[in-house]
């Protein structure tokens, strides 16, 4: 019996990078699933947007059946792989996607592992935080029912940070696009839960950055699930998108999301980024844009109130590709960071990528208070995260094309975002690929581990680890905890779930059975 290959092949209408992650996040870096401006399939090389969020929905019996047996042990995986080495063997293949969870780290960087397979649809494409209580994993092309590729809507799995996770059934909430819209990239990222309508319950704004509006493909939209005593469901929601003044094809609006009560009126507001959005420039193209959507008693406003744009009026800067909002400098006021992996410091400079920082307590419409830029062509700003090293908080920025393989750059918010070192591969490093995502985890009181994922490293993705102690970063080496033969885009997303664990996405994983 010939093998039956049931792998869904997606036309990734993307923006010039292979995201993986970001998806973020929020995770995020430039995204394989974000359309390139005026193009049907162009991308950078990474993913993500790491954001903070919450969600709620009760699984049906059919969904529970589909999720059954998704947690595959390492031993089972090896056994299944061995069974397929015989050319005459009968087996089936399903593109499930999945995640690895690594726990119980020792001081050497070794850890225990378990993995969870998805129901198709690139589970593990992006992994990100949803505030203090939850973390989420996206399956941006999952279908209802599972593996029915003609009905791919996307799905978001939300887990509690203090709960042990063994399978998708352990999700506190599972959300689908409430309109069951197809191929919209639902769940790519989400904002931290916040009270948008002022009723005392946290609401959840979720990305649907590939959603069409009429003939405008991938214009993007924000789906808000309104909270209740039981969390979120697909019955109470609203959809917001750009107004006619801005909306265009391939905007990818909501590729990045952040929530804060910006104007202090008691209603949380949403900032939504789209790396291809913004007014069309005289020579064609756009800069990228972040739009402000106002919270109110009736829910999130249908359209934007105002927008943020790069200071340099040049196309292809991808402003809004990643975003985070957090108190970075310890003054109890939220700071906003927006990156664009093609930003320019001035009209005459090359597209290096950069990040604009809007300090809390200032009028963000009047411009950024700090700006940082990378080297020419480095795609600096592909992903943004805050990390802790030695108990101190840093802004970490990924430059996917810097120094051949990518670098992670650290900035100190307490010192006006002064550069404080970076992770990079040594000159003798001889792999192919680029960094997709990264995060850190504490090994001991004086040692942190930085985990670097690259979905294109090796034959199916890899993670590399380096210790950080006394402000010194060790030479990176293949992480001791990763599978012997990683595959399926392993390392596309890397995330510390704040439960003493590192979660790694492998969205292209193929399950053989």
Residue ranges and their predicted role:
Residues 90-122, 126, 134-135, 146, ...:
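Blade-edge motifs of beta-propeller repeat domains
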Residues 151, 208, 217, 274, ...:
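Structural signature of WD-repeat beta-propellers
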Residues 141-147, 210-215, 276-281, 342-347, ...:
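Short glycine/acidic-enriched loop and turn motifs that connect beta-strands
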Residues 23-90:
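Ser/Thr-rich, Pro/Gly/Ala-heavy low-complexity intrinsically disordered linkers and tails
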Residues 125-138, 188-198, 255-264, 321-330, ...:
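Beta-propeller blade termini
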Residues 3-10:
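Sec-dependent signal peptide recognition
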Residues 83, 132-138, 198-207, 264-273, ...:
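Acidic/hydrophobic-patterned starts of short beta strands in beta-sheet-rich repeat architectures
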């Amino acid at each position: 019996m010939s093998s039956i290959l049931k792998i869904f092949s997606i036309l990734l209408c993307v923006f010039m990078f292979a995201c993986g992650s970001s998806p973020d996040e929020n995770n995020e870096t430039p995204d394989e699933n974000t359309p390139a401006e005026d193009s049907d399939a162009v991308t950078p090389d990474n993913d993500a947007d790491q954001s903070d969020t919450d969600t709620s929905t009760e699984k049906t019996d059919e969904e529970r059946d589909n999720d059954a047996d998704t947690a595959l042990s390492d031993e089972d995986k090896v056994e299944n792989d061995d069974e397929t080495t015989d050319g005459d063997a009968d087996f089936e293949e399903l593109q499930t996607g999945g995640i690895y969870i690594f726990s119980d780290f020792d001081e050497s960087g070794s850890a225990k592992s378990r993995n969870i397979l998805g129901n198709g649809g690139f589970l593990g494409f992006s992994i990100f935080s949803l505030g203090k209580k939850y973390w989420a994993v996206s399956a941006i092309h999952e279908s209802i029912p599972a593996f029915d590729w003609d009905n791919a809507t996307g799905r978001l799995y939300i887990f509690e940070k203090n709960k042990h996770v063994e399978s998708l059934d352990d999700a506190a909430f599972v959300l689908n696009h409430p309109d069951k819209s197809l191929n919209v990239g639902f769940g790519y990222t989400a904002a931290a839960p916040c009270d948008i309508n002022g009723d005392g319950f946290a609401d959840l704004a979720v990305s649907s950055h590939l959603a069409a509006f009429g003939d405008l493909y991938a214009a993007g939209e924000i789906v808000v699930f309104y909270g209740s005593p039981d969390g979120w469901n697909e019955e109470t929601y609203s959809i917001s998108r750009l107004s006619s003044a801005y909306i265009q094809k391939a905007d990818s609006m909501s590729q990045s999301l952040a929530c804060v009560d910006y104007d202090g009126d008691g209603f949380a507001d949403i900032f939504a980024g789209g790396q291809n959005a913004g007014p069309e420039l005289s020579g064609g193209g756009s800069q990228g844009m972040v739009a402000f959507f106002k919270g109110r008693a009736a829910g999130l406003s249908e359209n934007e109130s105002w927008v943020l744009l790069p200071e340099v009026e040049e196309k292809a800067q991808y402003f809004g590709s990643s975003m985070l909002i957090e108190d970075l400098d310890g003054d109890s006021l939220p700071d906003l960071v927006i990156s664009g992996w093609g930003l320019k410091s001035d009209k005459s400079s090359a597209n290096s990528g950069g990040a604009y920082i809007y300090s809390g307590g200032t009028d963000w419409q009047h411009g950024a208070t700090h700006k940082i830029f990378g080297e020419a062509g480095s795609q600096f700003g592909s992903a943004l995260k805050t990390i802790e090293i030695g108990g101190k908080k840093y802004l970490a920025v990924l430059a996917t094309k810097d120094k051949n393989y990518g670098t992670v750059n650290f900035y100190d918010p307490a010192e006006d975002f002064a550069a404080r070192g970076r992770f990079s591969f040594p000159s003798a490093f001889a792999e192919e690929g680029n960094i997709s995502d990264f995060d850190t985890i504490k090994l001991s009181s004086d040692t942190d581990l930085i985990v670097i994922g690259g979905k294109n490293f090796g034959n199916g993705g890899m993670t590399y680890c380096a210790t950080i102690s006394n402000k010194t970063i060790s030479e990176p080496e293949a992480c001791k905890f990763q599978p012997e033969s990683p595959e399926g885009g392993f390392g596309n997303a890397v995330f510390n779930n704040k439960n003493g664990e590192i979660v790694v996405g492998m969205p292209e994983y193929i399950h053989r059975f």
